[in-house]
């Protein structure tokens, strides 16, 4: 109900009705009052004119009785005529009740003294009680020449008339006026409602459009064809709606681009407001914050507080467990609505760069060491032979064997470096063929039989000779050679090395398992990285270059497969190779 009363249509309709009703009431009152006054005046004027004629007739007539009788024929109500010579000397014995009361009114009302003393016409409304009811009469006194035996300056012609006919006429006029006003008000009500509805229809459309715009719907554009202010308002609103839609689309596009850029960044990005609340973050930042420890959180909070105080860009290094970050905080004057300031935090994960830098350092140290040792041996034994220190044939042969072994070691190191460089420059190519896996494993079995016996290792091969795989023989030979060499290097006499085949619905699987020293958990994620080497104390004798497992991974991935490692420190390591089955 209240919502309807608040409607512009209802308000405008009620306003029009109120104005029209007020005007009709005032006009009706004025009309009724005027008509009452008009008929009263007309009656009074008619009575006065009758009184004047009777007065003139009486004054000019010599026979007063005949003049009075004749006068009674001149008026509408002959019984309402009284000619009084003396106000204070009148007999009421033969008069009717009404005339008695009228005569008493003339005698007792001082206003009528002016008729007898001053010769003025006097009119009064007199209420007469008769038969238990009251009736109003108009009583007019008109002066005439004093008659004989009169003690006053003037005699008076008095005429009275019942006002009931006037009242009936006024009542009829009042009823007609009220009925006319009601009919006019009804017509006005309908017309006002129609007019207000028509006038406010464009406004209601604009209201609906504004509601839709507030809800994000800019497609509704009402058509208002009028040329008035409402039509101009509608056109302006439609134009505004179009511009808002364009601006919102532009802002949405900018926001989407910004969010996409922020989410695609490799750095974690956080937006912090004055209340130290996170109002913006990307996926990388969420991942970092989910895995951050309390000390790192305290570090970030301190840097954020320092940035709020200094309002300068701060850049600091953060080390957390085995990960390394560079944290940059920048002060922003306006980061959210209301002109509130804040801080943008950028967290860059530098773990890979740090590890790569460390691996390069280790690689340089290892390669230098690997090169220095065989070169020193080559130099020492060749100098011994050249200088004649070693002269016995057996000693010379032994020295040359050492020189040959160290030369092979240098050649292997250089070849690995060249292979990696070639892979980086040209990529790795494999020539896959469908062939029995037994061909590869038989080759490995023969190749490492003597080495296993020499090292005291129990090496077993368990595979199905009829099963065929899709692989490059030379490349897979390189992979297994590297893995079995590693297993031999990290085991001791009595340990086991097992090479086993398996399969699932879509892949052929090869396990290389040893019971050696194993790999610590913190090294597992990095064993396939370039130049990465685990603790040298784990190895038996010679160390590698840190490139073997990296090359293995590249070869397996080029086959469309994967390589993984599982290890438990002190219990052994298992490398798992998965290759797609032949189509």
Swiss-Prot record:
CDD domains documented for this protein: HAMP, HATPase, HisKA
Report one GO cellular component: plasma membrane
Q: Name one GO molecular function term.
A: protein kinase activator activity
Keyword Nucleotide-binding in the entry? The reply is yes
- Which sequence ranges form a coiled-coil region, renumbered to this chain? none
From the UniProt record, give one GO term of the biological process aspect. Answer: osmosensory signaling via phosphorelay pathway
Question: Where does the record place the modification Phosphohistidine?
Answer: 369
Q: Give a yes or no for keyword Lyase in this entry.
A: no
Reaction catalysis annotation = ATP + protein L-histidine = ADP + protein N-phospho-L-histidine
Residues exposed to the Cytoplasmic side: 1-11, 196-583
Q: Which PROSITE patterns match?
A: HAMP, HIS_KIN
Q: What is its EC number?
A: 2.7.13.3
Give the SUPFAM superfamilies listed for this entry: ATPase domain of HSP90 chaperone/DNA topoisomerase II/histidine kinase, HAMP domain-like, Homodimeric domain of signal transducing histidine kinase
Pfam families associated with the record = HAMP, HATPase_c, HisK_sensor, HisKA
Q: Outline what the protein does.
A: Member of the two-component regulatory system SrrA/SrrB, which is involved in the global regulation of staphylococcal virulence factors in response to environmental oxygen levels as well as biofilm formation. Also plays an essential role in host-derived nitric oxide resistance by regulating hmp/flavohemoglobin, an enzyme that detoxifies nitric oxide by converting it to nitrate. Functions as a sensor protein kinase which is autophosphorylated at a histidine residue and transfers its phosphate group to SrrA.
Protein's UniProt name: Sensor protein SrrB
């Amino acid at each position: 109900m209240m919502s309807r009363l608040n409607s512009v249509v209802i308000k405008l309709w009620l306003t029009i009705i109120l104005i029209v009703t007020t005007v009709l009431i005032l006009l009706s009152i004025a009309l009724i009052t005027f008509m009452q006054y008009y008929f009263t005046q007309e009656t009074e004027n008619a009575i006065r004119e009758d009184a004047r004629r009777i007065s003139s007739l009486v004054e000019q007539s010599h026979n007063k009785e005949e003049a009075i009788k004749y006068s009674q024929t001149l008026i509408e109500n002959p019984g309402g005529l009284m000619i009084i010579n003396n106000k204070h000397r009148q007999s009421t014995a033969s008069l009717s009740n009404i005339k008695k009361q009228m005569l008493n009114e003339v005698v007792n009302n001082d206003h009528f003294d002016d008729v007898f003393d001053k010769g003025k016409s006097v009119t009064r409304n007199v209420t007469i009680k008769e038969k238990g009811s009251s009736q109003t009469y108009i009583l007019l006194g008109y002066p005439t020449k004093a008659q004989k035996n009169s003690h006053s300056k003037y005699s008076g012609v008095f005429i009275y008339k019942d006002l009931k006919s006037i009242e009936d006429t006024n009542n009829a006029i009042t009823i007609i006026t009220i009925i006319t006003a009601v009919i006019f008000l009804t017509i006005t009500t309908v017309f006002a409602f129609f007019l207000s509805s028509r006038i406010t229809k464009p406004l209601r459309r604009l209201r609906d459009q504004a509601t839709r715009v507030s809800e994000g719907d800019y497609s509704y554009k009402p058509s208002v064809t009028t040329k008035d202010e409402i039509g101009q308002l509608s056109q302006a609103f439609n134009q505004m709606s179009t511009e808002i839609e364009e601006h919102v689309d532009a802002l949405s596009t900018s926001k989407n681009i910004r969010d996409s850029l922020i989410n695609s960044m490799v750095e974690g990005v956080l937006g912090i407001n004055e209340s130290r609340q996170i109002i913006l973050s990307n996926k990388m930042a969420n991942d970092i914050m989910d895995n951050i420890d309390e000390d790192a959180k305290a570090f970030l909070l301190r840097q954020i507080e320092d940035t709020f105080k200094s309002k300068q860009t701060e850049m600091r290094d953060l080390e957390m467990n085995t990960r390394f970050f560079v944290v940059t905080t920048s002060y922003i004057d306006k980061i959210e609505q209301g002109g509130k300031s804040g801080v943008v935090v950028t967290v860059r994960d530098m773990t890979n760069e740090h590890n790569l830098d460390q691996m390069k350092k280790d690689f340089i140290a290892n390669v230098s060491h690997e090169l220095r040792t065989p070169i020193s041996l080559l130099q020492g034994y060749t100098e011994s032979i050249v200088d004649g220190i070693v002269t016995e044939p057996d000693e010379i042969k032994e020295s040359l064997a050492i020189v040959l072994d160290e030369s092979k070691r240098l050649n292997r190191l250089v070849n690995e470096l060249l292979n990696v460089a070639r892979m980086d420059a040209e990529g790795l190519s494999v020539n896959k063929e469908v062939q029995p896996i037994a061909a590869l494993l038989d080759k490995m079995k023969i190749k490492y039989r003597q080495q296993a016996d020499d090292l005291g290792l129990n090496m077993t091969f368990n595979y199905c000779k009829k099963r065929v795989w899709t692989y490059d023989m030379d490349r897979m030979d390189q992979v297994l050679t590297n893995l079995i060499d590693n297993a031999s290097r990290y085991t001791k006499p009595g340990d086991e090395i097992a090479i086993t085949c398996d399969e699932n619905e879509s892949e052929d699987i090869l396990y290389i398992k040893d019971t050696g020293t194993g790999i610590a958990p913190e090294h597992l994620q990095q064993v396939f990285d370039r130049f990465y080497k685990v603790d040298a104390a784990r190895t038996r004798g010679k160390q590698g270059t840190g490139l073997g497992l990296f090359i293995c991974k590249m070869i397996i991935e080029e086959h469309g497969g994967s390589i993984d490692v599982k290890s438990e420190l002190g219990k052994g390591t298992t490398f798992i190779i998965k290759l797609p089955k032949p189509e």
